[in-house]
Amino acid sequence: MSIATEIIGVPETLDHFQSESFSPYHFFSSEQWAKFRADTPLTLTSDEVKRLRSMGDPIDLDEVRRIYLSLSRLLSAHVESSQLLFEQRNRFLSLSDVTKTPFVIGIAGSVAVGKSTTARILKELLGRWPSSPKVDLITTDGFLHPNAVLQREKLMQRKGFPESYDTAAILRFLSAIKAGRPDVQAPCYSHLVYDVLPDEYKIVDRPDILIFEGINVLQSRDLPADGKIVPMVSDFFDFSIYIDAAEDQIHNWYVTRFMRLRETAFRDPNSYFHRYASISDAEALEIAADLWTNINLKNLRQNILPTRPRADLILKKGKDHLIEQVALRKL
């Protein structure tokens, strides 16, 4: 099924609905998208890309050339337009000595789909623009409720679902960022101990660009019955990206990553998942499949995939973890 059909949600037999004129997106193959790079310089080395990519993600310098340089150029245009609008509004309001608030980029997608790699690659590319902007990266992991809270509320098996996050804290953080406040605290998370680290924070001090990455960042909220105003996390985004792939592919990537972690991080006695390091491969495969089916697949279908049409840009991956198609929202 084509990305156009999936986004619109109609059968492929309805060819007239696949026309771009009936879609809010422009669609490009990776080869077409690569041509939009123009003269954007390649500022990363092969070794740097290897350092930035997540376990199991084969992204290389060629993929950066094909996909990310064009994306960097596009984001540069959006940031420049935002700066121009900021200046025009200040003139309209007769304001002076006003500091522009950060340009916020949201990145969403399933677990194991490659969000973190995309976020880290973009952080480096954007920070190396000629204007040398200050770029920060924050993930939503730190905004999960602590395990003690999840255990008390019987939500440990729902970790990663919307109710497992402190959404109010996310909104306070993004509101402070968009208000232009200095030294905003973002809670830290440890994948080793699988928990929020108490009293540990990353300080975000008025960056030019903030990348905010997590599975839940494009999700909407139920409107309260009392009529109170409820902001959405995505209300604070200037641009949003969804990393997409077929379910069976993400399943394979998730299981492969789980098995590799058994040979690496899980062997650390301090790891929350240390118990999985000593079981048989067959047992590990069964556990990984169960975790995928009963937790991550459900979350993908119920809460993550439905947010895809809300993204400004959709990067669709193929079975080799490399991006095959790009959808860009029309203006």
Curated annotation (Swiss-Prot):
GO MF term list: ATP binding; pantothenate kinase activity
Subcellular location: Cytoplasm
Example of a GO biological process term: coenzyme A biosynthetic process
Pfam families assigned: PRK (PF00485)
Pathway annotation: Cofactor biosynthesis; coenzyme A biosynthesis; CoA from (R)-pantothenate: step 1/5
Source taxon at top rank: Bacteria
Enzymatic reactions: (R)-pantothenate + ATP = (R)-4'-phosphopantothenate + ADP + H(+)
Protein EC: 2.7.1.33
One Gene Ontology cellular component: cytoplasm
Record's keyword terms, sorted: ATP-binding, Coenzyme A biosynthesis, Cytoplasm, Kinase, Nucleotide-binding, Transferase
UniProt cross-references to InterPro entries, sorted A to Z: P-loop_NTPase, PanK, PRK/URK
Residues the record lists as binding ATP: 109-116
Location, primary (coarse class): cytoplasm
Disulfide bonds: none
Broadest EC class assigned to this enzyme: transferase
HAMAP family: Pantothen_kinase_1 (MF_00215)
Family the entry assigns: Belongs to the prokaryotic pantothenate kinase family.
NCBIfam families: panK_bact (TIGR00554)
Stated name of the protein: Pantothenate kinase
Native source organism of the sequence: Rhizobium etli (strain CIAT 652)
